[in-house]
From Swiss-Prot:
The lineage of its organism: Eukaryota, Fungi, Dikarya, Ascomycota, Saccharomycotina. It comes from the Eukaryota. One of its GO terms (molecular function) is RNA helicase activity. Residues 28-138, 689-731 are annotated as: Disordered. This is Pre-mRNA-processing ATP-dependent RNA helicase PRP5. Residues 13-81 form a coiled coil. PANTHER family: ATP-DEPENDENT RNA HELICASE DBP3. It is an enzyme of class 3 (hydrolase). It catalyses: ATP + H2O = ADP + phosphate + H(+). It comes from Saccharomyces cerevisiae (strain YJM789) (Baker's yeast).
Amino acid sequence: METIDSKQNINRESLLEERRKKLAKWKQKKAQFDAQKENQTSRNDIVTNSLEGKQTTEKFTERQERVKEELRKRKNEFRKSDEPVSVKPSKKKSKRSKVKKKISFDFSDDDDSEIGVSFRSKEHIQKVPEHDNEKDPLDEFMTSLKEEKMSNSKGMYDRGDILDVEDQLFELGGTDDEDVEDNTDNSNIAKIAKLKAKKRVKQIYYSPEELEPFQKNFYIESETVSSMSEMEVEELRLSLDNIKIKGTGCPKPVTKWSQLGLSTDTMVLITEKLHFGSLTPIQSQALPAIMSGRDVIGISKTGSGKTISYLLPLLRQVKAQRPLSKHETGPMGLILAPTRELALQIHEEVTKFTEADTSIRSVCCTGGSEMKKQITDLKRGTEIVVATPGRFIDILTLNDGKLLSTKRITFVVMDEADRLFDLGFEPQITQIMKTVRPDKQCVLFSATFPNKLRSFAVRVLHSPISITINSKGMVNENVKQKFRICHSEDEKFDNLVQLIHERSEFFDEVQSENDGQSSDVEEVDAKAIIFVSSQNICDFISKKLLNAGIVTCAIHAGKPYQERLMNLEKFKREKNSILLCTEVLSRGLNVPEVSLVIIYNAVKTFAQYVHTTGRTARGSRSGTAITLLLHDELSGAYILSKAMRDEEIKALDPLQAKELQEMSAKFESGMKKGKFRLSKGFGGKGLENIKSKREEAQNKDLELKKNDKRSDDLEKKINNPHEGHDSEPESSALIPRLNYELFKESTDGSIIFYAKVYINDLPQIVRWEATKNTTLLFIKHETGCSITNKGKFYPEGKEPKNENDEPKLYLLIEGQDEKDIQLSIELLEQKVKEGVVKAASLSLKSTKY
């Protein structure tokens, strides 16, 4: 039995061993088969991937070439196009952020990293071969992203946002994302567009056929006025603060509201609700002139009723026109103001006349206010817009200029025009005027009329009538002028505190007397305004006064708009309140209760003094203006000595009056020697010194006589700022005049204007200043004219020998509008003045030991 069992075990073990060997052989063959299969699969994958990569690369290269070709075409079109494009910086930021998000989802495979993946193009996604039937989650994500983007862009367009230049430029290659090179090219184009067209409105050329006719002349002279003789008219104008008229065809002045032919509702509002009595001098002459449809320049002191002078004719012209249709936004009348405070004040006056008439709507558009509400009101349609130039430019450039149409504007008003130009709004106003129909009626009101403003009026207004009121004394006769001379800042601040305490004690006495008389007597409300020269001084004085127990309402441009508005409302609401502010409110603020103005920092210009003192004595009220002078503020003393009336100087302390005259004489003597100069408020030329240096080198004896003459002329100009406009400006004799010829040429039915400005004989530095690239680029940017250097330079005493020789050096200015040519020449003359200043400074430096 044991032998049999052992044999069975041996057979079993041999069988197991044989099976193990077979299993091992099978596993080996299986492993070899799997290895061969895996190698074959990998080789097939490599071949497939290489083919797919090659196809993708070829497709990408082909698309890239197509995009670049389109980009080059668009660049060429962009260079040829003269139409400016509005650009909104916030859109560019959002565009960049979107591009960054898309790049973050790119594949990181090494084989495809150089190619990149386009996520916005369905066409490109569909061309990628699919290896299975499952839907790619990346495709789903990008499809939803694209739909979301389209809905967002549509929503933004509906809200009237600006169409971004980059949105148009990035569409050159279909809807695919561009690579880094394409994005760089597009960003460069966007930058060029920004530099060329940021906040620049498109000039509109109107043909007579597309302009809707409108009526300008509504004035019918009453029998009483028409029966007046020329002698009676002259006597009436003399009695009305010596009205001076320039221009032809000016209507006769009126003396009663009933002579203007106003409607019954307007007459009731003026006489019974607003309690307007007789007409002011500017209203007597300006209202008939504007109602006759003439362009008017009104020059009158502040607080003389200029707003009503243009508001009544504007409302009458708007009512006579066809109402706005459903698809028209308007406006028909445009009023431009230098500050938001003045714009809000004008808007309030408009509201008084239109609140009972639903057919006339008014919108106030100023910076610092919410633009969304302004846009909503404009979309509903408005007949009158009161705006600051900067905000109106913003609105005109919204939605590529499609938000607001200027086609219906027939009446344009520039209130406080000298301040508009003093704040540097001339380029914006020029752009706005190019969008308005040429047969508009334009009215310009100002307290002063400098040469720069005169030049603008000549270009824009058509045969205007100039009305000047009280030209021999621009300071309101109801303002009592005083001053105090201090020898330190501490002494000046002590004088300020003393003036405020004296004012408070006076009001307490008056109030106690009123309390003892009757309960029906109104409480005295006499407000005060303190003007300082800077924001830092305003904050510093406010804190010092608060420490002294004096509460003020401080306002300056550095404070938030809401805080400024709140302080201004508090000043108007509280009785006997004190306003501390900078020059931001030196014009246009109308608070009739102001009885005292304190000029803490001496003014630098005569125009500034006129407007600062004009904050008191509004209408027929009286007021006091006190200037605190330091002993070294000579220019302020000179302005005061020329502005104050003789009876006011006689009423002063003799010692103070003597010191004022000494300071004024010292400044006047310094002007003769070129040591001092009086700023004109519009940048000041300061060229008297240049002339004196030039003539001193030529003839010292003649220089003394001409200095005396210049001093007399300057004194005359201070006493009578507008009388000097009849003669040639003083500065014109001090600067080399630009000789030029203006030509008009018609070719192929188009009219081209060009001018030749001869610069060969100008001094070298002046010639360089006028012909350098920055000057020419600046003029091209401002006017759109083409400027080219022509001819060659000939030294002094040499001329071209014959017609074949090149002419003397000159600048060729070409443009489509004669006014643009004139503006280019004026800008060139300003650069010539800068060159004269440089030449004079170099000459003075070369003579120093």
